[in-house]
Design a protein with these regions (language model features):
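Surface-exposed extracellular loop regions of Gram-negative outer-membrane beta-barrel proteins
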Residues: 114-154
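Cleavable N-terminal export/targeting peptides
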Residues: 1-25, 180, 187
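Transmembrane beta-barrel strands of outer-membrane/channel proteins
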Residues: 101-105, 134-136, 168-172
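Outer-membrane beta-barrel channels and translocator barrels
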Residues: 94, 125, 160-164
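Short strand-turn segments of transmembrane beta-barrel domains in outer membranes
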Residues: 71-81, 85-120, 141-142
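Transmembrane beta-strands of outer-membrane beta-barrel proteins
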Residues: 99, 130, 164-168
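Outer-membrane beta-barrel translocator/channel fold
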Residues: 48-49, 141-150, 156-208
Length: 208
């Protein structure tokens, strides 16, 4: 008598985002493959034509006009792509508890940068889901008085029934950025010997 084959049940996981103001659902992805993973930890992850102050986690602007997001009511956050907005928030339905952790680091002792992402999602049943996450960025910068520390958190939930759907989330952030005002003389970069009495090597942290 042949032994019966054991059936394995595959739990299908889905992800989606919603649009403003009607909350229309758009299918999204659950990124667990480290393809181009490094691109998440550079300032130019926003766009190939991105202009920033040179430090990860600081302000910047997409130079492709038609790819820019619409101006928000609080315009100070428009130049901070790390701030979570409604279209950026992902809802998950994983069936089982799921945690996605990402950590990236680079630089040396004086110019290190770190980013930690944690996303959690768990289901009460097939229709009701809860999620939470944090995003922490700490970067010292390449120049003096350029360090920043960004911390953001979010908590969300969704209900997908036969007749009704509800998606909601709450988020907050605390961003601390130093501003050095720029370099006083471009020759510290283009021709350092002229402004340093013949010395060609430059310590970025000492440039006035």
């Amino acid at each position: 008598m042949a032994a019966g084959k054991e059936k394995k049940k595959v739990v299908r996981s889905t992800a989606w985002t919603v649009s403003e103001p009607l909350g229309t659902r758009y299918p999204s992805t659950i990124d667990t493959i480290p393809t181009n993973y490094h691109a998440n930890f550079v300032q130019w992850m926003v766009s190939d034509a991105y202009a920033g102050t040179g430090n990860y986690g600081s302000q910047g602007q997409n130079q492709i006009f038609f790819d820019r997001e619409h101006a928000s009511e609080f315009f100070f956050e428009d130049n901070l792509p790390y701030v979570l907005t409604v279209p950026k928030y992902k809802f998950y339905n994983s069936g089982r508890p799921m945690t996605i952790i990402g950590y990236g680091f680079g630089g040396n002792k004086y110019s290190s940068q770190d980013r930690l992402n944690i996303d959690f999602s768990g289901n009460v049943n097939k229709k009701l889901q809860f999620g939470a996450g944090i995003d922490y960025i700490y970067s010292k910068g390449s120049y003096e008085n350029q360090a920043n520390k960004d911390f953001a958190w979010q908590v969300g939930s969704s209900y997908t029934g036969d007749r009704y759907e509800v998606q909601a989330f709450v988020s907050g952030y605390n961003l601390t950025n130093k501003e050095n005002g720029g370099i006083t003389d471009d020759r510290y970069i283009t021709d350092p010997a002229k402004v340093q009495g013949g010395q060609t090597s430059v310590d970025p942290k000492t440039i006035p």
